[in-house]
């Protein structure tokens, strides 16, 4: 289902530990693992048929907004999410800090 601005709806599927977009019989996902007060983001997957529509960006934004609402720190393992965070410094406060050595 598309919104008024043409974006597809992102749904939170906590039973599967992911955010998802369902379109054209396909599913794009951003998986997460909640570990205490941290949200580990290991994988984003967008089917080839859905690429080029900004769906990965929508998934990243929804996931990071949810992490902020929940007061979680983010551990971005997924290269796509890491690149998204570099392009969107407004989420820098969500990143975990390195442990002191």
What is the predicted function of each stretch?
Residues 52-63:
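Conserved acetyl-CoA-binding loop-helix of GNAT-fold acetyltransferases
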Residues 66-101:
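C-terminal structural segments of small proteins and small subunits
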Residues 15, 51, 96-100:
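Short capping/connector residues at structural and topological boundaries
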């Amino acid at each position: 289902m598309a919104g008024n601005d043409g974006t597809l709806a992102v749904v939170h599927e906590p039973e599967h530990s992911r955010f998802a977009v369902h379109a054209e019989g396909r599913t794009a996902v951003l998986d997460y693992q909640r570990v205490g007060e941290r949200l580990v983001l290991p994988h984003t997957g967008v089917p080839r048929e859905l690429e080029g529509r900004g769906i990965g960006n929508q998934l990243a934004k929804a996931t990071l907004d949810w992490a902020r609402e929940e007061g979680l720190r983010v551990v971005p393992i997924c290269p796509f999410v890491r690149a998204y965070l570099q392009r969107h410094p407004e989420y820098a406060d969500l990143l975990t800090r390195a442990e002191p050595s």
